């Protein structure tokens, strides 16, 4: 099989994997409202945290990251070049954003993009996660943390393993474009902050 054919097959596989909406499935399994019609309307871990609590959000985060990590890492093991790895990672994110199995209404792609970047190295994964966590703790805005972390990701990659700077920059660009509406709401002071689902008070 030629390298081009293998790359195209992996792009299709990555898109299909990304199209499995972890947020919708976890919410169905746990008897929670559809995240596409509750909270922010975004089927991602942050919105599931709002409507279903930390454990449900953690499950969504794990599976969304896995959707990006698996196809990208498998393609890396197959010897696919760095730019093509970036295209495969983007395909996984596009599957998450526009899922064919869920009416093309998906999330922002942040966790899936992070999952695709994480196999580059533990040091990069730690830098990305630490940046996002610190920014959320400071600002309480998940979207702002994602945008700034996406801007930092190519710089971290260039510093730690410059072979993958261009693919990571491609992913970061997609994430920032996907957050266009969030950026507008942030500028207007209308963006929702991160909050947990409140537990009912016991009598």
Curated annotation (Swiss-Prot):
Biochemical pathway: Lipid metabolism; phospholipid metabolism
Instruction: State the name under which the record lists this protein.
Output: Glycerol-3-phosphate acyltransferase
Q: PANTHER family of this UniProt entry?
A: GLYCEROL-3-PHOSPHATE ACYLTRANSFERASE-RELATED, INNER MEMBRANE PROTEIN YGIH
State what this protein does.
Answer: Catalyzes the transfer of an acyl group from acyl-phosphate (acyl-PO(4)) to glycerol-3-phosphate (G3P) to form lysophosphatidic acid (LPA). This enzyme utilizes acyl-phosphate as fatty acyl donor, but not acyl-CoA or acyl-ACP.
Q: Name one GO biological process term.
A: phospholipid biosynthetic process
EC supergroup of this enzyme = transferase
Organism of derivation:
Shewanella sp. (strain MR-4)
The UniProt similarity line reads: Belongs to the PlsY family.
The record lists the membrane-crossing segments as 6-26, 82-102, 118-138, 141-161
Catalysed conversion reaction: an acyl phosphate + sn-glycerol 3-phosphate = a 1-acyl-sn-glycero-3-phosphate + phosphate
Its record classes its membrane topology as: Multi-pass membrane protein
Which gene is the coding source of this polypeptide chain? plsY
Q: What is the lineage of its organism?
A: Bacteria, Pseudomonadati, Pseudomonadota, Gammaproteobacteria, Alteromonadales
User: Single GO molecular-function term?
Assistant: acyl-phosphate glycerol-3-phosphate acyltransferase activity
Q: Check the record and name the InterPro entries matching this protein.
A: G3P_acylTferase_PlsY
Q: Which UniProt keywords apply?
A: Cell inner membrane, Cell membrane, Lipid biosynthesis, Lipid metabolism, Membrane, Phospholipid biosynthesis, Phospholipid metabolism, Transferase, Transmembrane, Transmembrane helix
Gene Ontology cellular component annotations, sorted alphabetically: plasma membrane
EC assignment: the record states 2.3.1.275
Q: Where is the signal peptide?
A: none
């Amino acid at each position: 099989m030629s390298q081009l054919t293998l790359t195209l097959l992996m792009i299709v596989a990555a898109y299909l994997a990304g199209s499995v909406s972890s947020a919708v499935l976890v919410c169905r399994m746990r008897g929670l409202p559809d995240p596409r019609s509750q909270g922010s309307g975004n089927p991602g871990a942050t919105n599931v945290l709002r409507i279903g609590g930390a454990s449900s959000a953690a499950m969504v985060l794990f599976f969304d990251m896995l959707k990006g990590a698996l196809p990208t890492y498998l393609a890396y093991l197959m010897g696919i070049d760095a730019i093509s790895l970036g295209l495969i990672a983007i395909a996984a994110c596009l599957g998450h954003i526009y899922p064919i199995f869920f009416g093309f209404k998906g999330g922002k792609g942040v966790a899936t993009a992070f999952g695709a970047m994480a196999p580059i190295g533990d040091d990069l994964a730690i830098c990305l996660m630490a940046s996002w966590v610190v920014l959320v703790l400071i600002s309480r805005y998940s979207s702002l943390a994602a945008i700034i972390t996406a801007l930092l990701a190519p710089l971290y990659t260039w510093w730690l393993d410059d072979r993958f700077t261009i693919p990571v920059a491609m992913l970061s660009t997609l994430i920032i474009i996907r957050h266009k509406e969030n950026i507008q709401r942030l500028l207007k002071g209308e963006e929702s902050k991160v909050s947990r689902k409140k537990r009912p008070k016991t009598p």
